Regions:
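Metal- and O2-centered redox machinery and metal/ROS homeostasis
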Residues: 1-225
Length: 225
């Protein structure tokens, strides 16, 4: 079996897709729609204020993920460096653009800080759980994240393409390269380790969801300065 064939990443994908609603994805099995974030992105009514908070909180998580794999002495983290999916630098440029347009950039307000701290803890003691978050956070941005970017651009930004939705090279191949790397890292895992990784999926969705909800927050503050 080659790394391009079936691997553990396929199991991760199946578990994560089940946690979507049918409205969000064809494979979705989540039946209860608790709020707007559980609906198709095309039906969202985003706000600039909320979107800026989303970008700020997301950058904290990307900062943490990139720092962990860059600084760690553990050899398996080296496989996750320079994937081409890194977003921290691009988000920084986008936030600078918003600032140049007269928008106040909010400070971190909780979810991103909490998630980054949790990832730092996991990375030192629980590789299977960390890999779950690494996979879900990056892959979500290339799928639903791009739809969010398109919706926000069309409704709020006069169709401006932000840097965090641009990748160097063909995205399909970049994603396949990361799938191969994760399959390589997980190749020697026991079934118990794999199950532990999969069981972390729901928690990764909760952390991401806490950040995602900012996009739909009321436009009460943070307008042009």
């Amino acid at each position: 079996m080659t790394l391009q064939a079936k691997g553990f990443v396929d199991e991760m994908r199946m578990v994560s897709m089940r946690l979507h609603t049918r409205e969000q994805a064809r494979e979705g099995e989540k039946k209860e729609v608790k709020g707007p974030q559980d609906r198709s992105v095309s039906k969202w009514d985003p706000t600039i204020v909320g979107y800026l908070r989303f970008l700020v909180e997301s950058k904290l998580v990307y900062d943490a993920l990139e720092c962990i794999v860059d600084k760690s002495d553990f050899p398996y983290y080296a496989e996750l460096r320079n994937t081409g999916l890194e977003r921290s630098e691009q988000l920084g440029r986008d936030l600078e653009w918003f600032k140049s347009q007269g928008y106040g950039i909010p400070g971190p307000s909780g979810p991103g800080v909490n998630y980054a701290f949790y990832l730092q803890q996991l990375s030192a003691k629980d590789l299977p759980a960390f890999i779950c978050h690494f996979y879900n956070f990056y892959f979500a941005h290339t799928a639903g994240g791009r739809m969010i970017g398109k919706t926000v651009a069309e409704k709020l930004l006069n169709k401006k393409d932000l840097e965090c939705y641009k990748w160097d090279g063909e995205l399909k191949q970049i994603l396949q390269n990361l799938r191969d790397k994760i399959n390589k890292v997980t190749l020697g895992w026991t079934r118990e380790e794999k199950n532990h990784c999969l069981e972390e999926t729901e928690r990764s969705f909760k952390y991401s969801g806490d950040i995602l909800r900012f996009i739909l927050s009321p436009a009460s503050t943070g307008a042009h300065t």
